[in-house]
């Protein structure tokens, strides 16, 4: 339906190279009158809010003293947050590395769109990503 304002859920993992490129899209969606809620780690709150989206922190963010362990646990925290609130949205926009995005959107009964912020891709990688 053309002109209908949507309530959009975005989710990303806490990597600047993946998050920063998505913020331009957020600004465009907000400027078009859509409401965007963005699930992200606390370190990105300021950037997300500056884009016009409502910041939604991960459920139970990881608290390990080992940075690599926190990175792995961020995936689970992002997943749990989407699963808890995702059905309340018109669609899910998720980033390349959030592999459960498509299956999670199907489970929630909402359409989804995958962002790819990486520029150097080949056919093999694109084919592999198309299967997730």
Task: Show where each model-derived region lies.
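Glycosyltransferase specificity loop/lid
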Residues: 1-132
């Amino acid at each position: 339906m053309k002109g209908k304002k949507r309530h959009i859920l975005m989710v990303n993992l806490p990597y600047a190279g993946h998050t920063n490129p998505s913020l331009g899209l957020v600004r465009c969606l907000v400027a078009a009158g859509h409401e965007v809620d963005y699930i992200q780690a606390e370190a990105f709150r300021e950037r997300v809010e500056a884009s016009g989206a409502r910041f939604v922190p991960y459920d139970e963010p990881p608290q390990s003293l080992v940075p690599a362990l926190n990175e792995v646990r961020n995936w689970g925290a992002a997943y749990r947050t989407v699963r808890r609130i995702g059905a309340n949205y018109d669609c899910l926009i998720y980033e390349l590395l959030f592999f459960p995005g498509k299956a999670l959107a199907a489970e929630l009964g909402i359409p989804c769109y995958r962002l790819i912020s990486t520029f150097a891709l080949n056919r093999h990688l694109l084919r592999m990503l198309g299967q997730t």
